[in-house]
Amino acid sequence: MKRVLTALAATLPFAANAADAISGAVERQPTNWQAIIMFLIFVVFTLGITYWASKRVRSRSDYYTAGGNITGFQNGLAIAGDYMSAASFLGISALVFTSGYDGLIYSLGFLVGWPIILFLIAERLRNLGRYTFADVASYRLKQGPIRILSACGSLVVVALYLIAQMVGAGKLIELLFGLNYHIAVVLVGVLMMMYVLFGGMLATTWVQIIKAVLLLFGASFMAFMVMKHVGFSFNNLFSEAMAVHPKGVDIMKPGGLVKDPISALSLGLGLMFGTAGLPHILMRFFTVSDAREARKSVFYATGFMGYFYILTFIIGFGAIMLVGANPEYKDAAGHLIGGNNMAAVHLANAVGGNLFLGFISAVAFATILAVVAGLTLAGASAVSHDLFANVFKKGATEREELRVSKITVLILGVIAIILGVLFENQNIAFMVGLAFAIAASCNFPIILLSMYWSKLTTRGTMLGGWLGLITAVVLMILGPTIWVQILGHEKAIFPYEYPALFSISVAFLGIWFFSATDNSAEGARERELFRAQFIRSQTGFGVEQGRAH
């Protein structure tokens, strides 16, 4: 059990980010014209969709939630497209390529947060909210303070995630396309701004759907060709892989990648609860018409992602067999050309030739675009809807709110490009871990307790939420990744790499203690309002649906 927990928990560094899979040194490849042409086709097609979407974005609801008219199936595909990343595809298959069986536990670890979203969050979130999760958190609590806290939690997560994605995008494109790093970062930033600025959630949704379909098709074809090579026998697949892998039979043994059980548990909790607190994922539940469609979204998304992560396992073992044993894909020193993260890309060449290699490379780039578009829209909505329209200028018109949102998109895009260039040679892997830790320590406790705990008050939410956020940031800075590796100190003050176990505990305890000891009249009123909130969260009575949403 300890081994399984350890391996499962260690998935966090690979979770939903392109940067972490390729955060080390990369070796620039020759210009891949097939990949560039296929990617240009994707860009032209998606820009056409953005133009089509821009003609249909007439209101705030259209911009933030595509009018609430996305079906459960479409939204499930879009969620999968938002969550399945280049790290999932390249990083996990590379992990299987080097470590074998552990990669399966890693693949399954990606799904561990989704049952929480399905059973605890999706239905109530849709019934209580309109555009952002702050709508839910502030439903019966004080609007101003809660929205500021929720927006800060969202923006910090989005900023960290976005920087990691931009750096990852630059390195990935350097690997796959042979393009200059700076050109790659600017290209991703400009396309991201165009999708969100003109097409809003409708364009973002269709970019994510198209990317998910392309990625699932590409991975399915690769897995099919691998299985065809071994006569559709898993026994043959594993036997041939063990025969050519340097570790031999040891690649079928689990565990051993994370030694410390406290770190393992902390990572696992960060991944599980962090997924349920990611603002760009939560925002997708407002794009459907009702709670039933929200539940269907999670059901379909989990199915698509589960299928995809099983494919990455087959692809990893296929790479051991068809790439690892082929000197054509090795350099003079005997290492894989471009590094181990190129294992899946080389396999694409091995099973489908140059044309399919170009297709897979283009899909990897499309993967990053889909993720950053969702992040940018989530960040913009936190500023325009939560802060501008509900805190700083109450009663702002829809037109004013949309103008602020689009200005925020431009600012976020420019900042992302600048920081992507500045962080080119920095260790940015910790940013994703910190983003998940903050989502788990600030956003998740607030969402969960606001929907389920009748005694929650504004005072408890504010003090506990800020404590969780600050604890996550401080412990991350004092931990070995930043304190030792980046700042150069000899020994870390906080001994564990990821802080989620401790910061989540601080957040929940803080919210409970300061709410339980809140004897104010305001606190009593907020507790009384829970009954009405509970009825709406269960029945959906009064929820705006579809185009009226």
From Swiss-Prot:
Q: Does the keyword Membrane apply?
A: yes
Name of the coding gene: actP
Question: Under what name is this protein listed?
Answer: Cation/acetate symporter ActP
Which residue positions does the secretion signal occupy?
none
Q: Which PANTHER family match?
A: CATION_ACETATE SYMPORTER ACTP (PTHR48086:SF6), SODIUM/PROLINE SYMPORTER-RELATED (PTHR48086)
Naming one, the record's GO cellular component terms include: plasma membrane
Name the source's superkingdom: Bacteria
- Any Pfam family from its record, for instance, is SSF
